[in-house]
């Protein structure tokens, strides 16, 4: 397997994050750098701690530990259709993630 965002052990990855209950840093969804807990069950992004809910969510696969909002978090897809459940969603790519996002879309 190619060394990419799916290679476990990376401390940081560029991921797709969609707030199913509202906005995320002024957009419905964002693509940006995240870090993980040592157990890989918590994703950290923009000061938020998103805990994996393992199929117990209604619309998402992670929940914000502080606000209770549900999130859909996934890897970057080459075709760009990262939105969960085929929804029309506006996505903003963080400035510091643009180069890596383009590389991932080409390699995927």
What are these regions (language model features)?
Residues 1-33, 40-42, 46-108:
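Mixed-charge, low-complexity intrinsically disordered regions
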């Amino acid at each position: 397997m190619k060394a990419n965002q799916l290679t476990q052990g990376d401390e940081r990855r560029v991921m797709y994050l969609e707030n199913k209950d509202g906005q995320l840093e002024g957009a419905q969804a964002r693509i940006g750098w995240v870090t993980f807990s040592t157990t890989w069950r918590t994703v950290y992004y923009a000061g938020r701690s998103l805990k994996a809910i393992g199929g117990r969510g209604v619309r998402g696969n992670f929940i914000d530990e502080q606000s209770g909002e549900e999130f859909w978090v996934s890897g970057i897809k080459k075709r760009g259709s990262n939105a969960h459940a085929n929804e029309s969603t506006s996505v903003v790519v963080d400035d510091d993630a643009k180069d890596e996002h383009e590389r991932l879309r080409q390699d995927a």
